[in-house]
Each structure stands twice: as C-alpha cells, then as structure tokens.
Amino acid sequence: MTGGVDVTERTIPAPKEIDFGTEMIRGFAFDNVLHSETEGDIHFGLYVPENYDGHKSYALFVTLPGYEGLYFQGVGVNIRSEDYGTEAKEYNDEMLIVAPQLNDWREPSARQTVALTRYFLEHYNIDPDKVYLNGYSGGGETGSLVMEYAPELYTAFLHCSSQWDGDLKPLIEAETPVYMATGENDSYYGSSSVRETYDELVRLYREKGLTDDQISELVVLDLKDQAWFDERDIKDQHGGGWYFAHEEDIMNWLFGEHE
C-alpha cells in the first residue's frame, strides 16, 4: 500500500484558502478546512500519495460518509469508521482521496461537496476524466443531490445503502455512470427507493434513445440478499453496507473504465 504524507510538509504551494491540519489518521491528514466564500467552512481529510508532485495529473476520489462520520461526531471519525477511502488506495496509487466531514446529508452538504471537488480540479493537477464519488448511507443521499447539481464533474458514482433524493434529469443529460448497492431489506432505508430510481433511470435513458447495452454501462442495481450478509457474518443489512468497500467487483466498477 502506498503511504500517505503530511501535506503541510510538501513542497507543493499550499492554497491560501485551505488551512491544513496536522493530525494523521490511517494515512489521511486532518482537520483540513477549505474556506469557501459561498459555502462556508468545509472540513475534510486528505490522502496524498508519496509520489504526487503536481507535475503529472492524478485521479481524484471523494468519499461521503454516513451519519456516524459527520463533522460533529469528531475529527476523522469518517476515516476511522468507514473503509471506502482507505481501500481506494489499493485500486489506484496515483489518486488523491478527499474525505469530507459534512454537517448533514442535505442540500448544503451537497453544495459543499461540489465546491470542494471544483477546488481540487482547479488547484491541483487532477485528470478530469478520473474523478470518482461514493456515498454511504446519508452520504449516498448527499451524493444523489450532487448528481443533480453537478453530475458532469464526476466520472462515476457509487451509491451504497441509501436512498435517492436528487432530480434525475441532470444525471440523464450528463450520463454519469451510477452503481447502486444495498441490501434487499436494508434496515434503515429499505430498497424501494433504489429500485424505483433504477427503473426510472432505465426508462429515461430509453426515452433518450440509448440501447439496453448502453444503459447497462450507465446504471447498475446490486441488491444483496440476507445470505450475502450471512456469509460475511453481518447481521444488519444497513450497517453492513460498510463492507461494500471490501468487494473487489464493486470497487473495480467504480475505478474501472467508463466511456
């Protein structure tokens, strides 16, 4: 695994709008704060590969936490309690990973996510064709709103153990690929929201003239039954959504090739 570095010691000029933290948690620097003129203070963790020097374009992964990872729960608790950010290192050693600690799962946090993503695209050497987003639980709700506000910024979105809150029309226009993974009987959300979202996305893409093969590249619904959770000794289908970070087929989809 590629080790992280303390970004405060880098030779890369630090953006004036960011106050970098000094605490290292699982390879991520905390508590960084982007001071946005429009969206306020945005707290986040940051992983920078040791070999990043700003000369070569790198991928960017933004991982949105569930309720237990929000900022009021404590600095860095998102990276302590969820593995999406730490596991992502295994899939691309040339990728910056941003782990926002937002204040809720609603519109303000979605706007902050977009602002943070745009900031990294504008101030770091990021490949715009390799910008990935995931959201677990409440973070999935936030991510679905991000897909309403600025889907064109992202290469693919992994939506885990959540429900869909965003308007689908901008997503259809942008054709950003979406993978929705959840338990058939998720104890918090159920699965009706993602089922209905999947059906509506398929319908809208067909109306747009896309073939079923094309649609299958843009929308994936992955419903896990209780047997899947039992095999992994996971009792609760909602809480067990953290384990999707350890499923290679799911993570390979996110970081794979998307036309």
Regions found by a protein language model. Name each.
Residues M1-Y58, E141, G209-S216:
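A domain-start/cap signature at the N-terminus of enzymes
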Residues N51-K56, W105-S137:
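Gly/Ser-rich "nucleophile elbow"/oxyanion-hole loop immediately N-terminal to the catalytic nucleophile
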Residues K56-Y58, Y71-V77, S109-R111, L145-V146, ...:
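Short, solvent-exposed loop/turn and secondary-structure capping segments
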Residues Y58-V114:
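Active-site machinery of serine-nucleophile hydrolases
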Residues G66-L70, L102-E107, S137-E141, S162-G166, ...:
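Solvent-exposed loop/turn segments at secondary-structure junctions
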Residues D93, I172-V178:
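Short, proline-enriched alpha-helix->beta-strand connector loops that line the catalytic pocket
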Residues H123, D129-I172:
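Primarily recognizes the serine-hydrolase "nucleophile elbow" in alpha/beta-hydrolase
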Residues L168, Y179-A181, N185-Y189, R195, ...:
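C-terminal catalytic histidine-bearing segment of alpha/beta-hydrolase fold enzymes
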